[in-house]
């Protein structure tokens, strides 16, 4: 993929194999343990990380026996503890679309943004329903209110810029 100028993304972490619910419409609840997840669904992600996949996209699924409160996309347990710490992923984490029912119907946008930045999601997928200027303003307001720090945001910026440098998509002198 790199030779063709494409940045590969493994998705949807930690796997959609245990649900038939379409996350565009609702939030699936998956009843499995962490050990079961590591023994099956996480295997392709472990292999992708070992092969140095540059990015991983989250899945909007709630694993109620692992994190009963938040879906993977918003979960410290999955994003920080499992993906970053236990699996050792240092690349770019991409959210799945935030307009999808699994997120938009259950969580407010400001709360979603706080969790995304706090728990190391680097690229946030937003499309038709949001204006980027409004999102930037909202992030600035969250920083001013003390709900986010500039470092929360800049961690992702640094990872995205490192990925762009790795693929020759940014002039290092311009930074």
For the regions a language model picked out, list residue spans one by one.
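Cofactor-pocket helix-loop regions in the catalytic cores of large enzyme subunits
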Residues: 175
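Second-shell residues forming the walls of enzyme active-site clefts
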Residues: 1-152
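Mid-to-C-terminal alpha-helical segments outside catalytic/metal-binding sites
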Residues: 144-172
């Amino acid at each position: 993929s790199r030779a063709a100028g494409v940045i590969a993304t493994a998705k949807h972490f930690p796997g959609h194999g245990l649900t038939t619910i379409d996350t565009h419409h609702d939030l699936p609840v998956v009843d499995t343990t962490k050990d079961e997840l590591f023994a099956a669904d996480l295997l392709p992600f472990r292999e992708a990380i070992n092969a140095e996949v540059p990015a991983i996209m989250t899945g909007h699924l709630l694993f109620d026996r692992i994190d009963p409160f938040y879906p993977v996309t918003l979960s410290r347990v999955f994003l920080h503890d499992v993906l970053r710490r236990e699996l050792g992923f240092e690349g770019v984490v991409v959210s799945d679309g935030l307009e999808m029912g699994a997120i938009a119907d259950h969580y407010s946008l400001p709360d979603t943004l706080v969790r995304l930045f706090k728990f190391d999601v680097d690229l946030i997928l937003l499309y038709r329903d949001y204006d980027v200027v409004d999102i930037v303003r909202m992030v600035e307001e969250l920083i001013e209110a003390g709900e986010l720090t500039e470092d929360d945001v800049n961690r992702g910026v640094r990872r995205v810029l490192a990925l762009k440098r790795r693929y020759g998509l940014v002039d290092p002198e311009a930074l």
